[in-house]
Amino acid sequence: MSVGFIGAGQLAFALAKGFTAAGVLAAHKIMASSPDMDQATVSALRKIGVNLTPHNKETVRHSDVLFLAVKPHIIPFILDEIGANIEDRHIVVSCAAGVTINSIEKKLTAFQPAPKVIRCMTNTPVVVREGVTVYATGTHAQVEDGRLVEQLMGSVGFCTEVEEDLIDAVTGLSGSGPAYAFTALDALADGGVKMGLPRRLAVRLGAQALLGAAKMLLDSEQHPSQLKDNVCSPGGATIHALHVLESGGFRSLLINAVEASCIRTRELQTMADQETISPAAIKKTVLDKVKLDSSAGASLSSDHVKPLP
C-alpha cells in the first residue's frame, strides 16, 4: 500500500511522521505534492524520507490512499485537476474542514463513475501518535476501505467512524482542540512566570498537569466534574482559583469557541461550493494587497509620521 498527500503542509507532515513512527508505513511508500517546494514542511518531509513532487497528478499515480490535505476552498480546483487520474484502486480521503462527501463525489463522478471517498477530521497530535480522528464513508466506499483508513489513523491515535453530519461538531471540539489546549497552557505558564517560576519549568509543569489530567479521565469512568471536585479541598487554593475561572466565564468561553469553530467549518463548505475564486487568484490578491499596504504605509510614513528625535 502506498499513501499520497495532495498538500505538504503541517497536517501532511504530522500524518507522515506518525505513520512512519508507528511502523505501519515506510517513508518511501509516501509521496506528497506542493507547488511550493521551499516551504519548511516540505524540507521536514524530505528529512524523514518522504518522496516530494510539485505535481499533484504524480502523487495520484503513485498512491493507493490519497489524502486531500489542502484548504477547503482549494478542494474543487484540486479535484478538477486530478479527477481524470483517479482510478478504481484509489481511496480518496478528504481532511478539509467542512467539505462534504457529496461535494467531492459530485466532482469526481464526472471522471470516475464510482469514486471511493472518505471524509475525515483529525488533529495535529497525530505527529506524536496521540491524535483524534473520526471518519465517514461515502456512497461507493466499501467496508474494507473504511477499515483500511481506520487502521492507518488508529496507528496515530484514537479513531472511530461517525455519521457525516457529526463531523463539523468534531472539528469544533477535537479538530481545533489542540489550539485551545496550547492557548490554555501558554496562559498557565504565564501565571507561573508571574509568580516567580522560570519559563521552561512553568511550561513543563503546565503541560504535565494537562497530560496527567487527560490520562486520569481516559483511564477512569468518572465524570470530569467529579475528578475536578476531588482536587478541591474545602476552603483550599484550588476552589478559590476555580471561582476566578467561573467568574470570568471560563466554561462559556470554551463552549462558544467550539460553536464558533463549528459554524466557521460550515461557512467554509459554502465557500468551497461557490468556487468563486481560484488558488492563483487568491495568491495574486494577497500579493497585490501586500504591495498596496506597503505603498500606503510608505506614503503614510513620509507624509504624517515624524522621525523620533
From Swiss-Prot:
Provide the primary localization: mitochondrion
Q: Which InterPro entries match?
A: 6-PGluconate_DH-like_C_sf, NAD(P)-bd_dom_sf, P5C_Rdtase_cat_N, P5CR-like_CS, P5CR_dimer, Pyrroline-COOH_reductase
Describe which pathway this protein belongs to, using the record's wording: Amino-acid biosynthesis; L-proline biosynthesis; L-proline from L-glutamate 5-semialdehyde: step 1/1
Q: Which UniProt keywords apply?
A: Acetylation, Amino-acid biosynthesis, Mitochondrion, NADP, Oxidoreductase, Phosphoprotein, Proline biosynthesis, Stress response
Q: What top-level branch of life does the organism fall under?
A: Eukaryota
Question: Pfam families, from UniProt?
Answer: F420_oxidored, P5CR_dimer
Instruction: Provide the free-text tissue specificity comment from this protein's UniProt record.
Output: Highly expressed in osteoblasts and skin.
Q: EC number(s) for this protein?
A: 1.5.1.2
* N-acetylserine: residues bearing it: S2
Respond yes or no to whether keyword Flavoprotein is given for this record: no
User: What is the catalytic activity of this protein?
Assistant: L-proline + NADP(+) = (S)-1-pyrroline-5-carboxylate + NADPH + 2 H(+); L-proline + NAD(+) = (S)-1-pyrroline-5-carboxylate + NADH + 2 H(+)
Q: Quaternary structure?
A: Homodecamer; composed of 5 homodimers. Interacts with LTO1.
Q: What does this protein do?
A: Oxidoreductase that catalyzes the last step in proline biosynthesis, which corresponds to the reduction of pyrroline-5-carboxylate to L-proline using NAD(P)H. At physiologic concentrations, has higher specific activity in the presence of NADH. Involved in the cellular response to oxidative stress.
Protein name per its UniProtKB record: Pyrroline-5-carboxylate reductase 1, mitochondrial
* Organism expressing this protein natively: Mus musculus (Mouse)
Q: Which gene encodes it?
A: Pycr1
